[in-house]
């Protein structure tokens, strides 16, 4: 690595600052740390969250007869038994043992029995933010779900408002108006009753109390009022009952409307004044009064009893039962939980209108005040009061993230509730003297829920490891599907659509095409998740028109009230906003505002988009649909044999490669003292300790691509034998044995080397003189990077610490003989010959030798009935040697399985003892290379019970064979740029036939110019032009998203590189040597080879497996199936009158079993006439009709019934014609 010169990088960014980027896999790591709290030194002082909260919510457990109680003290985490790599090799789970200190207290004697109880193995997150489950790397994707809290919505069709109380766990409570204009409450979407019944059950018993709770009132005079004054009160409603004092009769009930008759009655009764409801905005709104009329009760006791009889029909209603039921539904922590988030949402919703009641409130159950406030809010919505709005459920203030830690906690809660049930059962059954925590606790439910969650949950996914970007994006993915989320079929347009609150939190571009569009999203680059699970994005604060250095993270609902300037706003030297009017964002609008009215400013232009999208240069010139494809296709790029960083990038490449944790990053400041292909040794500052970093070499990823790390740091070796004559910071001088002087410079580009020898020291050729100085990584408490550590080794698709998913190739945009018609791509033979787009793919093949009823299977070289050629690459134990070239059908591991043995005769026993296994009755069950695969064996792993390896039950020995294959670029392979410009290789042209430039340089690739204008992805044109300048000048460009190079910048560099400003060149036809008529646009474009390789897709079948029922060939490459001839193909053959071809295809080539066997015989014997039989699908049809009670009878021409099964045998002898009749059963 010594002496390697780095490319100079030119960054066009004026505003973009990547230093503020959070750690990109922080969402995974922080969430799991929150759950586990493994770094807390005092185990008894963990915070009430995650795993600790699960234990605390389950314990203490009291026995049903109250004679003992089980308490929890704290949990202890052990060390994982194996390293992550060992787990991958042995198909094990990377987990640590979880133990809990549990006390059993016997109440009668006060005796305390304390034990440390093993609670099972808990899967642990690796440093990369992944889990290893049964040897496979998996990622738990964060879920985007509706936040708990109270939500108000508006139904446009019915023109009504509704309110919903959504808890984290427990019964849902809803309020809405029914068809009769009554405000009703619904519990769990089933039980319906007037909302006032619930309000009265909370202690506000009379109608008057309820009305006074929600409305203000005003007294109006009756006695002595003029007719004009009395007219004003007509149509208004009383807030209290008006009673005739003499008779005690209620003349007007609370909520009654005042009319002329009522006024005359009031005058007769000599009522001086009435207290009337003051409706908001003076509009009469009777929905609450209608509910009071409907509920039919007028005191607390009647209300709560009626509530109980509605909820628990058929059960006896007493005040005690009713109160218990109401408490169970909403006020008990055991059955109802809003979560911290739900309480926070309720407080922030009502604090605005009722600050005294809600500030500082921490209760996680519902409170009567919450229900009252909800009813008040919905009444104000119906009255159209100012500052009362329905909620937007798609707003990110109402959707939150459930990350790994929370998802595991929720699963464990269900497991622990089952454990609690088992403990209570065992407490009653077992003798009190013998009981201990260990005997009472069953850990089966816990291990079951853990295994189910990691193994089969929709949110625990097999990690996409195609390349580092795919891995990083997978960890940052947000999924709105899954348990407790949306379903693909019911999600409408609104949920999927881009919302203004997504700005800086979720990427508006990166989402799949197809049914999951808008449901699976990606976090924006700068976004982070706060303690409540809401997405936050950073802004620079603006005070009095001056941009401060302070950065604040805002959630979507906090952002609602502010005006936010764009990152591109012009700032002077003092940091003040220059222009008088500045374009800002406010909710969904873009108003112009004075600098003094602005509170915040965007941090960087790329905070809108995700990491994938931020890797597209000139994104601002691409259409959004193509940018979406570009983002998604970068994740499918196959790591190449020779990585090359793009000439034109965005500056995000380095950070994406670093944060993906695919490279090896140095942990402590120091000096590299030794480097080889497998290890890097770094001596720490001070020289007392050293760290050894092990490199991963040629391992298979989940997707079969090759994972290989290569060192990029180095040491300085002496090239001669001699003595060190001079050592300084700048250089080391070595005097050779013959007196020659050799100088070694210690500063090359950005790499600084530190001497590890001293003057006068004897050195031999190859001795280490100096090591590269490396910086250690430093993180803050949140896991964000304060100081980036030196990258010691590149991973796959990384070039010198820079993400390198493809290669820079010389391209021209011109049609060429139709070979690049419709997005096809013409490439030069040089690309194939020089392995420009070659990649290594690794396949794993596994065989297990099991114990069978007839004896054990054996891995052996002694396999009956095979030629010596089949054994040529097997070793003496029957396993293939490393380095062997294998083709389809070759034996990888020889294995025999015993057949059913009869009693052996003495002669057979003698033969068996002389000739060994071959004479024995065994069947060949060797592992062979499957169809369509070939390559070189690169690794073999053997595990057996004899070597104390852990194997699944019944398995005696297991062998894994890894076969690698170099895949060159082929016709049919899919390739793409970063702008959604994808295509398929149509032809590999000889280099001499490719178009060439005036200086004789042949092109690498020819693309169709018609693919650009209609798709509106002009970013590729700018990239190609700037790429040519980069190639000529020997530099690399970084053009950040929305903050990159402008046309003038591109022109300036083209001038510097002596290139035409339009990047058009005179090209010559390689076949004729004649120039093309027009000049052609040429330059260097970055092209990726995608994981859609033609070799994985191409497939042919002669004979193969058939479906059991229909006897038709199976479908698909995986089943070695055939090509389906569907009804449309049948129509086409019918149209041409090709009756014999059609008959052949529908019978002997498909499901005519007899005909299939006969045609084989005919081909062997050379007979050309063949008579088709009856297709098996006809028999299936007959049986299907019989299942529908239709009696199908087959008759010959004379009307005799023919049995179809006999008929098959008869068919070859008989030439009779058959007719079919259908007789419907009466």
UniProtKB/Swiss-Prot annotation:
InterPro entries for the chain: DNA-dir_RNA_pol_bsu_ext_1_sf (IPR042107), DNA-dir_RNA_pol_bsu_external_1 (IPR019462), DNA-dir_RNA_pol_su2 (IPR015712), DNA-dir_RNAP_su2_dom (IPR007120), DNA-dir_RNAP_su2_hyb_sf (IPR037033), RNA_pol_bsu_bac (IPR010243), RNA_pol_bsu_CS (IPR007121), RNA_pol_bsu_protrusion (IPR007644)
Keyword entries, A-Z: DNA-directed RNA polymerase, Nucleotidyltransferase, Transcription, Transferase
EC primary class: transferase
PANTHER family for the chain: DNA-DIRECTED RNA POLYMERASE I SUBUNIT 2
Family: Belongs to the RNA polymerase beta chain family.
Gene3D superfamilies referenced in this protein's UniProt entry, alphabetically: 2.40.50.100, 2.40.50.150, 3.90.1100.10, DNA-directed RNA polymerase, beta subunit, external 1 domain, DNA-directed RNA polymerase, subunit 2, domain 6, RNA polymerase alpha subunit dimerisation domain, RNA polymerase Rpb2, domain 2
GO CC annotation terms, alphabetical: DNA-directed RNA polymerase complex
Subunit structure: The RNAP catalytic core consists of 2 alpha, 1 beta, 1 beta' and 1 omega subunit. When a sigma factor is associated with the core the holoenzyme is formed, which can initiate transcription.
NCBIfam families linked to this entry: rpoB
Biological processes per GO annotation: DNA-templated transcription
Pfam families reported in the protein's UniProt record: RNA_pol_Rpb2_1 (PF04563), RNA_pol_Rpb2_2 (PF04561), RNA_pol_Rpb2_3 (PF04565), RNA_pol_Rpb2_45 (PF10385), RNA_pol_Rpb2_6 (PF00562), RNA_pol_Rpb2_7 (PF04560)
Gene name in the database record: rpoB
Domain of life: Bacteria
Function: DNA-dependent RNA polymerase catalyzes the transcription of DNA into RNA using the four ribonucleoside triphosphates as substrates.
EC number per UniProt: 2.7.7.6
Protein name, UniProt field: DNA-directed RNA polymerase subunit beta
Example of a GO MF term: DNA-directed RNA polymerase activity
Signal peptide from the UniProt entry: none
Catalytic activity, reaction form: RNA(n) + a ribonucleoside 5'-triphosphate = RNA(n+1) + diphosphate
């Amino acid at each position: 690595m010594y002496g390697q010169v780095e490319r100079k990088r030119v960054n066009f960014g004026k505003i973009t600052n990547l230093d503020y980027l959070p750690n990109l896999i922080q969402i995974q790591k922080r969430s799991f740390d929150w759950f586990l709290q493994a770094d807390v030194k005092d185990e008894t002082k963990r915070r009430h969250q995650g795993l600790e909260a699960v234990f605390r919510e389950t314990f203490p457990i009291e026995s049903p007869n109250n004679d003992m109680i089980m308490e929890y003290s704290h949990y202890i985490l052990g060390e994982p038994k194996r390293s992550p790599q060992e787990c991958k090799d042995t198909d094990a789970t990377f987990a640590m043992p979880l133990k809990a200190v549990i006390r059993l207290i016997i109440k009668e004697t006060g005796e305390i029995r304390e034990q440390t109880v093993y609670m099972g193995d808990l899967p642990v997150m690796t440093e990369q933010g992944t889990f290893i489950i049964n040897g496979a790397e998996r990622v738990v994707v964060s879920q985007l779900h509706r936040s708990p809290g109270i939500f108000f919505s508006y139904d446009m069709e019915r023109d009504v408002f509704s309110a919903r109380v959504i808890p984290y766990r427990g019964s849902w409570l809803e309020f809405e108006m029914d068809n009769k204009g009554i405000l009703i409450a619904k519990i769990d979407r089933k039980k319906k009753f007037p909302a006032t019944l619930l309000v009265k059950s909370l202690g506000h018993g009379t109608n008057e109390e309820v009305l006074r709770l929600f409305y203000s009132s005003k007294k109006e005079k009756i006695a002595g009022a003029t007719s004009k004054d009395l007219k004003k009160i007509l149509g208004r409603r009383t807030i209290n009952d008006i009673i005739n004092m003499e008779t005690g009769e209620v003349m007007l009930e609370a909520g009654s409307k005042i009319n002329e008759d009522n006024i005359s009655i009031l005058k007769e009764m000599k009522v001086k004044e009435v207290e009337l409801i003051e409706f908001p905005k003076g509009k009469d709104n009777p929905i609450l009064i209608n509910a009071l009329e409907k509920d039919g009760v007028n005191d607390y006791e009647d209300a709560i009893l009626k509530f109980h009889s509605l909820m628990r029909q058929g059960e006896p209603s007493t005040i005690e039962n009713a109160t218990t039921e109401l408490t169970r539904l909403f006020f008990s922590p055991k059955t109802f939980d809003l979560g911290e988030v739900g309480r926070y949402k309720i407080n922030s919703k009502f604090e605005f209108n009722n600050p005294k009641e809600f500030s500082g409130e921490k209760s996680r159950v519902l409170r009567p005040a919450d229900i009252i406030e909800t009813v008040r809010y919905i009444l104000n919505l119906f009255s159209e009061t100012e500052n009362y709005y329905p909620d937007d459920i798609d707003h990110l203030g109402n959707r939150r993230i459930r990350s790994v830690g929370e998802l595991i906690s929720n699963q464990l809660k269900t497991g622990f509730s089952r454990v609690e049930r088992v403990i209570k059962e065992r407490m009653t059954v077992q003798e009190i003297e013998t009981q201990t925590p260990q005997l009472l606790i069953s850990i089966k439910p816990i291990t079951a829920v853990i295994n189910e969650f990691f193994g089969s949950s929709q949110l625990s996914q097999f990690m996409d490891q195609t390349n580092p970007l795919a891995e990083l994006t997978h960890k940052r993915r947000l999924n709105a599907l899954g348990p407790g989320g949306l379903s693909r079929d019911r999600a409408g347009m609104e949920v999927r659509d881009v919302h203004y609150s997504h700005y800086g939190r979720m990427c508006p571009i990166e989402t799949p095409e197809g049914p999951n569009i808008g449901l699976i999203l990606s976090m924006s680059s700068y976004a982070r998740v706060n303690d409540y699970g809401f997405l936050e994005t950073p802004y620079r604060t603006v005070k009095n028109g001056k941009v401060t250095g302070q950065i604040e993270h805002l959630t979507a609902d906090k952002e609602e009230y502010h005006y936010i300037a764009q990152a591109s706003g012009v700032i002077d030297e003092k940091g003040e906003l220059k222009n008088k009017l500045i374009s800002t964002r406010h909710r969904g609008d873009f108003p112009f505002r004075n600098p003094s009215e602005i509170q915040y400013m965007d941090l960087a232009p790329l905070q809108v988009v995700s990491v994938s999208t931020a890797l597209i240069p000139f994104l601002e010139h691409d259409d959004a649909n193509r940018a979406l494809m570009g983002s998604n296709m970068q994740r499918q790029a196959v790591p190449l044999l020779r990585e090359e960083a793009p000439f034109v990038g965005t500056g995000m490449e380095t950070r994406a490669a670093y944060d993906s944790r695919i490279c090896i990053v140095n942990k402590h400041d120091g000096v590299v003292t030794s480097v080889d292909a497998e290890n890097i040794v770094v001596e720490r500052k001070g020289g007392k300790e050293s760290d050894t970093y092990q490199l991963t070499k040629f391992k298979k990823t989940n997707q079969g691509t090759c994972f290989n790390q290569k060192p990029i740091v180095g040491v300085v070796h002496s090239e001669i034998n001699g003595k060190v004559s001079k050592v300084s910071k700048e250089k080391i001088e070595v005097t050779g044995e013959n007196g020659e002087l050799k100088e070694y410079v210690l500063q090359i580009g950005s790499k600084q080397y530190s001497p590890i020898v001293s003057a006068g020291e004897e050195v031999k050729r190859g001795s280490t003189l100096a090591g590269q100085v490396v910086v250690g990584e430093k993180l803050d408490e949140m896991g964000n990077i304060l100081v980036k550590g030196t990258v010691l080794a590149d991973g796959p698709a990384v070039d010198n610490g820079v993400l390198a998913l493809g290669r820079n190739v010389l391209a021209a945009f011109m049609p060429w003989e139709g070979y690049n018609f419709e997005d096809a791509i013409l490439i030069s033979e040089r690309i194939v010959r020089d392995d420009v787009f070659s990649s290594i793919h690794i396949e794993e093949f596994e065989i297990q030798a099991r114990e069978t009823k007839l004896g054990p299977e054996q891995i052996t070289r002694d396999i009956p009935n095979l030629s010596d050629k089949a054994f040529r690459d097997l070793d003496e134990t029957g396993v293939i040697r490393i380095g062997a070239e294998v083709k389809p059908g070759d034996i990888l591991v020889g294995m025999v399985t015993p057949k059913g043995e009869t009693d052996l005769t003495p002669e057979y026993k003698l033969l068996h003892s002389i000739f060994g296994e071959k004479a024995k009755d065994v069947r060949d069950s060797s592992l062979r290379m499957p169809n369509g695969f070939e390559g070189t064996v690169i690794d073999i792993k053997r595990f057996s019970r004899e070597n104390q390896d852990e194997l699944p039950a019944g398995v005696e020995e297991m062998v894994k064979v890894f076969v690698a294959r170099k895949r060159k670029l082929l016709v049919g392979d899919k390739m793409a740029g970063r702008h959604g410009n994808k295509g398929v290789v149509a032809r590999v042209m000889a280099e001499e036939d490719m178009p060439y430039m005036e200086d004789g340089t042949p092109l690498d690739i020819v693309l169709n110019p018609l693919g650009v204008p209609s798709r509106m992805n002009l970013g590729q044109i700018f990239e190609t032009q700037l790429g040519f300048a980069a190639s000529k000048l020997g530099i690399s460009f970084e053009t950040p998203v929305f903050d990159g190079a402008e046309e003038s910048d591109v022109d300036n560099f083209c001038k510097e590189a002596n290139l035409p400003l339009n990047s058009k060149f005179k090209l010559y036809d390689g076949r004729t040597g004649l120039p093309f008529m027009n000049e052609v646009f040429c330059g260097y474009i970055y092209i990726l080879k995608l994981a859609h390789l033609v070799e994985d897709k191409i497939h042919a079948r002669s004979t193969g497996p058939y479906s059991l029922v229909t006897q038709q060939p199976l479908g698909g490459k995986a089943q070695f199936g055939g090509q389906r001839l569907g009804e449309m193909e049948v129509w086409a053959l019918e149209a041409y009158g090709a009756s014999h071809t059609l008959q052949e295809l529908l019978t002997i080539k498909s499901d005519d079993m007899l005909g299939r066997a006969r045609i084989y015989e005919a081909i062997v014997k050379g007979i050309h006439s063949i008579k088709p039989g009856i297709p098996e699908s006809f028999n299936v049809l007959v049986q299907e009709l019989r299942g529908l009670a239709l009696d199908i009878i087959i008759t010959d021409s004379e009307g005799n019934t023919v049995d179809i099964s006999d008929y098959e045998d008869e068919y070859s002898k008989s030439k009779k014609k058959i007719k079919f009749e259908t007789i419907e059963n009466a």
